[in-house]
Amino acid sequence: MAEQANQPTVLQKFGGQFHLGSSFSEGVRARNICPSVSSYDRRFTTRSYMTQGLVNGGINVPMMSSSPIFANAPAEKGGKNFMIDFLMGGVSAAVSKTAAAPIERVKLLIQNQDEMIKAGRLSEPYKGIGDCFGRTIKDEGFASLWRGNTANVIRYFPTQALNFAFKDYFKRLFNFKKDKDGYWKWFGGNLASGGAAGASSLFFVYSLDYARTRLANDAKAAKGGGERQFNGLVDVYRKTLKSDGIAGLYRGFNISCVGIIVYRGLYFGMYDSLKPVVLTGSLQDNFFASFALGWLITNGAGLASYPIDTVRRRMMMTSGEAVKYKSSMDAFSQILKNEGAKSLFKGAGANILRAIAGAGVLSGYDQLQILFFGKKYGSGGA
């Protein structure tokens, strides 16, 4: 029972999976972006995979993410047990990501379809999630729905190791307390620590996210006789380095780091504004009200920052192409001018479905761990 106390419940995973962010927000999750809400503190949150529930200014700060929550091994367990939790978390991440991979690929295809059309790799726009699923299976086969998943699973391990390496340093560097140092200093410290830790981890694993994005969006050429652009993960690196050099693997990195800070600012801003207004009177200790508020804030911040994810992935898609965006601002302005604001939110609906699917699979996986091992190990995040 003591072992299970640090593990997220089914509802925690379900709520955590609703986060609409993506890779840039993984750096945010590494710094515990989501403060708990009232009774949500006591009944619904868990220690995050980075700091085991870092407390900032009296607010317990758990993680809510688009990826499953990973509960890190407590320090007193020792290296051996931590490694077991780390590896089991990897298995958990692989299971969750693989189960949700078809929806993830559809999300990326819908999100980047306009870039694919410009490059001549898609004949016509997708009409929706169902149309994207149907056309992908018809043109490429059922197994193609998992294209790019290998890079996504591999990315988990270095991300977790880097998060573990960076967490203590940035925790000490920006250790402001809300009640002691004041709100704005605490707020700024949260943005700075999240941005620094997120960017540090992201720097080392960004190329894997780039490769995953390119593979997932590598639909059989509309005008090329059904030929793919890349033959696998290694081929993505080889062709990108040949055409664009190292810069090609990091296209969109700067806006990704900005996205970390934007998400943190939106989350904490909405939390501090809505909690005193909504959770009052009889709702103060109401579990469902607390959960609803947490869900609303997480999705609100994720949806508001979603255009940043779209811009960075659209920039990724131009590596190897003759025409590239000059900067993230150029990409943003061109997308708005030529396609409209709606294009910045393409794929957001599929992202919600992916989150729900991942949470459901992880919940079942946790029960299997209890059945076979007598306890729950860490659940793969990132």
UniProtKB/Swiss-Prot annotation:
One GO cellular component, as annotated: mitochondrial inner membrane
GO function term, MF aspect, one: ATP:ADP antiporter activity
FT transit peptide: 1-71
Membrane-protein topology: Multi-pass membrane protein
Regulation: The matrix-open state (m-state) is inhibited by the membrane-permeable bongkrekic acid (BKA). The cytoplasmic-open state (c-state) is inhibited by the membrane-impermeable toxic inhibitor carboxyatractyloside (CATR).
Subcellular compartments: Mitochondrion inner membrane
Annotated binding of ADP, by residue: R155, K167, R312
PROSITE patterns: SOLCAR
Keywords tagged on the record: Antiport, Membrane, Mitochondrion, Mitochondrion inner membrane, Repeat, Transit peptide, Transmembrane, Transmembrane helix, Transport
Solcar repeats: 80-173, 185-277, 285-371
Reaction(s) catalysed by this chain's protein: ADP(in) + ATP(out) = ADP(out) + ATP(in)
Main location: mitochondrion
GO biological process, one term: mitochondrial ADP transmembrane transport
Entry superkingdom: Eukaryota
Sequence intervals crossing the membrane: 82-109, 150-174, 183-203, 253-274, 288-308, 348-368
Region (Important for transport activity): 312-317
Motif (Nucleotide carrier signature motif): 312-317
Domain-level remarks: The transmembrane helices are not perpendicular to the plane of the membrane, but cross the membrane at an angle. At least 2 of the odd-numbered transmembrane helices exhibit a sharp kink, due to the presence of a conserved proline residue.
The protein's role, per its UniProt record: ADP:ATP antiporter that mediates import of ADP into the mitochondrial matrix for ATP synthesis, and export of ATP out to fuel the cell. Cycles between the cytoplasmic-open state (c-state) and the matrix-open state (m-state): operates by the alternating access mechanism with a single substrate-binding site intermittently exposed to either the cytosolic (c-state) or matrix (m-state) side of the inner mitochondrial membrane.
Subunit structure, as described in the record: Monomer.
Family recorded in the similarity comment: Belongs to the mitochondrial carrier (TC 2.A.29) family.
Protein name as annotated: ADP,ATP carrier protein, mitochondrial
Organism from which the protein derives: Oryza sativa subsp. japonica
